[in-house]
Amino acid sequence: MADVKNRRWGRLVALGVTLAVLVPLGFLWATSLVPGEYNPAEMGYADHGGGPSMDHEHHHAGMSVDDLAGPKTGTPNVDVTLVARKQKFQLASGETIDGYTVNGTSPGPLIRARVGDLVQVTFVNESVKDGATLHWHGIDVPNAEDGVAGVTQDAVPVGGKHVYRFKAPEAGTYWYHSHQVSSDEVKGGLFGPIVIASPSPGEVVAAIHTYDGKRTINGRTGTGRADVPAGTTARVRVINTDNAILRVGLIGTPYRVVAVDGRDVHGPTAVTAAYPLPAGGRVDLEAVVPAGGMRLVAGTSALSLGIGPAGAEPPGGDLPGDSVDLLKYGTPAPIGFDPAKADRNFEYRIGRRPGFLDGMPGLWWTINGHKFPDVPMYMVAEGDVVRMKISNTSGQAHPMHLHGHHAVVLSRNGIAATGSPWWVDTLEVGNKETYEIAFVADNPGLWMDHCHNLPHASEGLMTHLMYEGVTTPYRVGGDSHNEPE
């Protein structure tokens, strides 16, 4: 009889232990589920950064992102049609890739404009089955033109088209890419370069991208070349369209870092060190072409672009071990506002912990301790001066990209910036690093703020900067078929 009682008691204890484990797990699983279709303006929770509270869902009468559009009238100065296709294509170096093209090539065609030009792009989806969009990475366009599926528009279905119109705001090096299933479509080749500037004799555009493990410059593996006469001041516009930081630089002559993320560097000096270019970031390198030429190196000497007079063989070799540090490069200059008088002070703490995301077990990214979609929505009003501290204890680096704005770096790991104002739209935040940035909220809308290692964004490392009173008629997931990451 005692044995029977002991067995019963043992079963009850085992059942209790099992329930004690399964019930919390079931709760965590259930609360991790992302709604089949949701409004991105209503996800997460409102973070007002110490400023006045605003109704997270409906403040005042509300303004739709559709109202925040580019010019509806006027003859465009730049008028192009871009056609997206899912297809097999050949790289410039001959390898066959099964991916995505724009007008039959990848990278897609260069879009060139001048400051103040009205740009009109008619985007046609010929055969990208999941739909596609065009996002203008680094160009602070009006919100409706931002090209984010489910936030500022619906993804363009096969057979559909969408027209983007915006004024080219500032000279610089930028790029366009799909922001629908971007972790797949950008990787597969749905992107291209944009330059806002008049063409110059020494200009070289170098878009770096990895296709199926093959890293390329302008779609070419190995060594390419660009003919530029000796004595010409060359401006090499480098675009990192991959998901990880890459060291780049010129060898064969000293060079200057003259622009970062489409913003001029004040007082650039000659360097020979490599430049660490974040995923999604751009850098303009300037040098006078020597008689023997020079070479852009991307990562290692296995991928390079010789730049020099026809017939010259530019010097080869790897980049030096030291790197340009923008925290102290160049000379100070006014930034146009006072970060010490911030209206909002935000924290963006990036971490990682085990759990469930949309019912899937794993090790997931967190923002301020919360997993997507229960992440902070950074709430601002137009005209606010905003400070944000971005810290990273996740174990991996993250290239953080804020849409619609450029921010200035104030400090890294508590050390104040002393060089040129370091303006960014894409900032590499390494593990155990902390950056302070500041910007003016001067472009109303609903703006993504996410990691541009795009698989990380698809795993939940994304949120939004949300302006008072702005709503969106678009939805993400479910029957909307919008999946921005």
What are these regions (language model features)?
Residues 87-91, 117-120, 127-131, 174, ...:
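Primarily extracytoplasmic ectodomains and periplasmic/lumenal surface modules that are beta-strand-rich
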